[in-house]
Amino acid sequence: MEAILKLFGEYFFKFCKMSGYDRMLRTLGGNLTEFIENLDALHSYLALSYQEMNAPSFRVEEGADGAMLLHYYSDRHGLCHIVPGIIEAVAKDFFDTDVAMSILDMNEEVERTGKKEHVVFLVVQKAHRQIRGAKASRPQGSEDSQADQEALQGTLLRMKERYLNIPVCPGEKSHSTAVRASVLFGKGPLRDTFQPVYPERLWVEEEVFCDAFPFHIVFDEALRVKQAGVNIQKYVPGILTQKFALDEYFSIIHPQVTFNISSICKFINSQFVLKTRKEMMPKARKSQPMLKLRGQMIWMESLRCMIFMCSPNVRSLQELEESKMHLSDIAPHDTTRDLILLNQQRLAEMELSCQLEKKKEELRVLSNHLAIEKKKTETLLYAMLPEHVANQLKEGRKVAAGEFETCTILFSDVVTFTNICAACEPIQIVNMLNSMYSKFDRLTSVHDVYKVETIGDAYMVVGGVPVPVESHAQRVANFALGMRISAKEVMNPVTGEPIQIRVGIHTGPVLAGVVGDKMPRYCLFGDTVNTASRMESHGLPSKVHLSPTAHRALKNKGFEIVRRGEIEVKGKGKMTTYFLIQNLNATEDEIMGRPSAPADGKEVCTPGNQVRKSPAVPRNTDHQQQVYKGDPADASNEVTLAGSPVAGRNSTDAVNNQPSPDETKTSVVASGPVLSAFCVVL
């Protein structure tokens, strides 16, 4: 598990670089020690954007000879093994240095108020791979490698023996001296070797210092305040005169440690945030936000005192105003001024960005609503017009009228509809028609025919328009059979009996086009429409009346058709018409588009051109057309259709008590193997 966490640390560092944080990380420090010392400051900055972030804390003890003890604090137990992976990757990538890390001690830190787990790492430098851009060459060999391992193990043992005896500030021995004596790197320092020059005396007057640094506090080991900047005295009255301890005026917000010199010295390289206590503030300031000071703690060994160099922890003009402060209270050299002004601009940009995001979200919601409404409109438009015609109208193009050489038109109406309307309430008529038309509309999808219009009880559909297909007659015929079945499910509101419909079908050429601008309709024109209407008006209740051309279109297509005979058709003269009885190759479920369970595993096509398992459709076995003729005298004879016994029908029943001397009962079946009308592929 430790190896996995270490590997995760290495990849986490690579992920941070890929996410664009590499420039920020490179500027934290000029060497590994400075890099680690400033990690807490980076976490403090990131916490402004990620308020839920719970970052660990790091503290470094170092010596001039290249010694390092890394203290890791976290309230997440078991994740300390990620640290070596991150630190070693940083040292190799940013500082071209190979380091090895091992754990010296693990315990619970009692001096901290937040981060509980305290892990001490020993950081040992292996060898310099590159110093200031120049390659350092060193012979490689088994002896050197063995010596390095022995030196590393020896250093580790010495550190484990001496670690717990290291004193911390304050003490007789300075903190840096203790670390320098205990932790030694044998391969060179991790810090630069620059040596500054200090003056023999401080050339700054006390008053000038307090004015130039208006926010600073000097306190001793007992937390007694010895010195304070002018603005500290202004906003924390009595801090010098009342002789109270500093921890009575302030509490430490970050890092989460107890307020004493020992704890502060342990985190001397961390950024400190102090907050005034409300109970110590004057009554006039208790209602205002408490003053927060952010800065650095510096231990002065010769004076045995700590100085806190700080600035007001405000991020915007609004916070500055709420604290009853002004920009003039902040020293001109203090970058807090620039931070407040820049952050104010950033807040304004963020506000604009938030408003933009809000508007984008509103626009997205409106776009979704518009898409939904557009889809509803298109659905309604496609219900009124053919899809390709509707698309042309949406694009603003004119739809040219089209001539179709052959198509099949169907008309239907309700028998005695006028009498039903006279005996019922209007709402009953509406409910009856709505129930009937809903069933018919579903059948148009099953058989893929186009519904042209409905006027009162009249229902008109066409096959082969607006998309020409060879199977238009079969589709309309199957639709008519489905209409006849569906009509039996709709009750007459007067008698309570199933309603009866008349259906007429005719095949021929038509002219089709869009008529009207305000409410455009797709209409059919030509004598074919008139003839189809005449077939319906001259039909009989519960019968599907066929014209001669419709009969020819359905011939040899697997339908049972009965010859009605010659009748007088208004405006057409005498015509020989027929009645459509049934589809010999399809069941009622297939006609109605109902799902049927598979029986013998054979695949057949359904009226909706869908393939599913179903019993085989009966076929003619002798592959020859069989025509049976008779007259009323021998109508009782039994005949065989498509190889199955069918009882002979009385011709007077066939025409509903309107016999004709020329009437002949004819049954036409397919010669040879015939595909069902529903299996035609467009």
From Swiss-Prot:
Residues 649-667 have a biased composition (Polar residues). Heme binds at H43. Its cofactor is heme. Binds 1 or 2 heme groups per heterodimer. GO terms for biological process: cGMP-mediated signaling; response to oxygen levels. Its EC number is 4.6.1.2. One of its GO terms (cellular component) is guanylate cyclase complex, soluble. InterPro entries: A/G_cyclase, A/G_cyclase_CS, H-NOX_domain_sf, Heme_NO-bd, HNOB_dom_associated, HNOB_dom_associated_sf, NO_sig/Golgi_transp_ligand-bd, Nucleotide_cyclase. Belongs to the adenylyl cyclase class-4/guanylyl cyclase family. This is Guanylate cyclase soluble subunit beta-2. The gene is Gucy1b2.
